[in-house]
């Protein structure tokens, strides 16, 4: 990139062209005169169309202008050339010139050269120290930033707000949360605790380590607030799943007239995604559109993920289509969305489209398409992409192997899945054996299931999931003694099954239910509603699958137990409290059991609604008596 200078300095534009052909700059102490640069007189006698033969003597302002241009446009080579000429001038020991050079090298990322300038400066002031500290902080050298800050204090220099904000950022990056209170106290001592720049840095440090009360105290103490301080606090609460507080602060920020950044939007979309606050996320998205913000990749990718995780795959696709620019994260987000929703053929099509437009798939891309193939029964396609990944030079990681085992296992090729595990170049992880165990549950292979379970217990004895799966395998085969042995082992080792719960969001409120829930104020209406639905689905052929009841009781009691699983209660509640014909969204913290899957599938037909259920494995779109998974899950 060429330097662009004011008209008065057009003649000096020839410097870059002329000097690029000269030797590389050398130290001012070099004894080799042949490597020295020509004199200032020769260099500054340049020609241009309008300043033929004119002479402009170099002064501090001239050199500063050159260096600032080099800094702005990150022209490190030209900056070195200017530096070499300063060394031949009367400004070689000038403190202002030294600070400008130091800043140029630091901003261009050449920190070693910046440090050499610093060390050779005969005089330094607080600007000198601050510039070097800021350079280290901005270029991921937090240890050096903290080291030079300590030296600065030892030499008796007083920091300003920019010094302190850089040091606080360095402490945050260095994961020295313990330094936060010490630095905060130092800022109070120096009188900078209410400064907006220092306060914003402290906010970021405290929120990174979850010290939200301390962050709020800093925020409240600020004499004035800017968009950085607002965004830092919003992002902090969003990261810590304080979605409601983050949304409350977002509204306060708007009332105070500040403009949200793309970082704020991304934080809020991410928080709404992780906590299931779809309606609030839609409101933030609507405000973003109203304010005229472009949907750039950073916030757009998070918004796409929010819609996908909330069950709105079509909205996720719309966001992808509207992105001003798509990066590999954008494509991966779309692929992951299709994988989670079980749309394997669509994921395969978009993966090929990604390659066609020149975006090189990475390890996440391949993981997503493998997952999509696994969830859709696309065995041949999945194996093709596993081989393609290796051809593309991407070394499979543990999660890729998990997905391939899942792919083979779901397809019923359990022996091939076992051989694949035994021949892997890595030691099988608990997750890999668990994938085989799940496949054994699906295909009722008791012996191989027990073999896989033993490996999981050895590698991850505290995970209750594999114990429950093995119990269900034994129970479904009528092997109650073996099932009882599993329960006894769980009790003796202190492993407890995670309580199942389901929840729905209605009118910006989350309603959570557990099995046999007796606490809800509408419990009687909920029970009547489910009995009504149950009678209708039985007319369509529903028969309770009592193999999913993990307690050994008589058949009648097992059937009663089945009808009060948390997802069925959540469905009945949603039917009572949402408009007829509207889509119902239910989320569950563990895998949906087979009986509930069948019941909800038939319920979608008798109530005439689309019901979207998200569990830990995937999304199920129930509509007109069918499920998007095609019962392959």
UniProtKB/Swiss-Prot annotation:
GO terms for biological process: RNA modification. PPR repeats lie at residues 94-124, 125-159, 160-194, 195-225, 226-260, 261-295, 296-326, 327-361, 362-396, 397-431. One of its GO terms (cellular component) is mitochondrion. It comes from the Eukaryota. It is found in: Mitochondrion. Residues 508-538 are annotated as: Type E(+) motif. Residues 539-633 are annotated as: Type DYW motif. Pfam families: DYW_deaminase, E_motif, PPR, PPR_2. GO terms for molecular function: RNA binding; zinc ion binding. The keyword Repeat applies. Residues 1-63 form a transit peptide. Keywords: Mitochondrion, Repeat, Transit peptide. Residues 432-507 are annotated as: Type E motif. InterPro entries: DYW_dom (IPR032867), E_motif (IPR046848), Pentatricopeptide_rpt (IPR002885), PPR_At4g14850-like_plant (IPR046960), TPR-like_helical_dom_sf (IPR011990). PANTHER family: PENTATRICOPEPTIDE REPEAT-CONTAINING PROTEIN, SELENIUM BINDING PROTEIN. Belongs to the PPR family. PCMP-H subfamily. This is Pentatricopeptide repeat-containing protein At3g24000, mitochondrial. It comes from Arabidopsis thaliana.
């Amino acid at each position: 990139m060429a330097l662009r200078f004011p008209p008065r300095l057009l003649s000096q534009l020839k410097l870059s062209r002329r000097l690029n052909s000269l030797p590389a700059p050398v130290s001012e102490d070099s004894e080799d005169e042949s490597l020295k640069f020509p004199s200032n007189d020769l260099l500054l006698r340049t020609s241009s169309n309008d300043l033929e033969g004119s002479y402009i003597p170099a002064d501090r302002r001239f050199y500063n202008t050159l260096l600032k241009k080099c800094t702005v446009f990150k022209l490190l080579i030209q900056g070195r050339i200017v530096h070499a000429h300063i060394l031949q001038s009367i400004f070689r020991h000038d403190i202002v010139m030294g600070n400008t050079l130091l800043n140029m090298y630091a901003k261009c990322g050449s920190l070693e050269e910046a440090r050499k300038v610093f060390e050779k400066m005969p005089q330094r002031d607080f600007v000198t120290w601050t510039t070097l500290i800021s350079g280290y902080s901005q270029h991921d050298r937090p240890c050096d930033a903290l080291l030079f800050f300590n030296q600065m204090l030892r030499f008796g220099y007083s920091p300003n707000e920019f010094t302190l904000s850089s040091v606080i950022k360095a402490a945050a990056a260095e994961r020295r949360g313990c330094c936060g209170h010490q630095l905060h106290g130092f800022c109070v001592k120096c009188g900078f605790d209410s400064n907006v720049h220092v306060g914003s840095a402290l906010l970021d440090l405290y929120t990174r380590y979850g010290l939200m009360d301390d962050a709020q105290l800093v925020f409240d103490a600020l004499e004035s607030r800017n968009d950085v301080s607002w965004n830092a606090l919003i992002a902090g609460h969003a990261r810590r799943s304080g979605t409601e507080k983050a949304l409350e602060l977002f509204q306060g920020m708007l009332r105070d007239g500040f403009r949200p950044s793309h970082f704020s939007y991304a934080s809020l979309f991410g928080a709404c995604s992780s906590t299931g606050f779809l309606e609030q996320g839609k409101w933030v998205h609507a405000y973003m559109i109203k304010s005229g913000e472009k949907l750039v990749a950073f916030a757009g990718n998070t918004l796409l993920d929010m819609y996908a995780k909330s069950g709105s795959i079509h909205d996720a696709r719309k966001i992808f289509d509207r992105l001003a620019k798509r990066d590999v994260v954008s494509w991966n987000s779309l692929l992951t969305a299709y994988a989670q929703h079980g749309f394997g053929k669509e994921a395969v099509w978009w993966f090929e489209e990604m390659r066609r437009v020149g975006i090189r798939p990475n390890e996440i891309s391949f993981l997503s398409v493998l997952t999509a193939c696994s969830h859709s029964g696309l065995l041949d396609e999945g194996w093709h992409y596993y081989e393609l990944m290796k051809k593309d030079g991407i070394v499979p990681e543990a999660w890729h192997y998990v997905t391939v085992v899942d792919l083979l296992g779901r397809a019923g090729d359990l022996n091939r899945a076992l051989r694949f595990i035994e021949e892997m170049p890595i030691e099988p992880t608990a997750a890999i054996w668990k994938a085989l165990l799940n496949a054994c549950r699906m295909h009722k292979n008791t012996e191989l299931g027990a073999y896989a379970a033993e490996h999981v217990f050895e590698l991850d004895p505290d995970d209750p999931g594999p114990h429950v799966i093995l119990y269900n395998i034994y129970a479904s085969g009528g092997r109650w003694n073996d099932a009882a042995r599993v329960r006894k082992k769980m009790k003796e080792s202190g492993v407890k099954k995670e309580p199942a719960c389901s929840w729905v969001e209605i009118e910006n409120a989350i309603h959570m239910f557990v099995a046999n829930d007796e606490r809800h104020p509408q419990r009687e209406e909920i029970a009547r509603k489910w009995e009504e639905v149950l009678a209708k689905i039985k007319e369509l052929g529903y028969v309770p699958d009592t193999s999913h009841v993990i307690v050994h009781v008589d058949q009648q009691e097992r059937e009663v137990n089945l009808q009060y699983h948390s997802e069925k209660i959540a469905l009945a509640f949603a039917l009572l409290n949402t408009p007829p014909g509207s889509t119902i969204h239910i989320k569950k913290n563990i895998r949906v059991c087979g009986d509930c899957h069948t019941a909800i599938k038939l319920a979608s037909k008798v109530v005439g609604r689309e019901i979207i259920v998200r569990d830990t494995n995937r999304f199920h779109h129930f509509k007109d008596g069918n499920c998007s998974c095609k019962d392959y899950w």
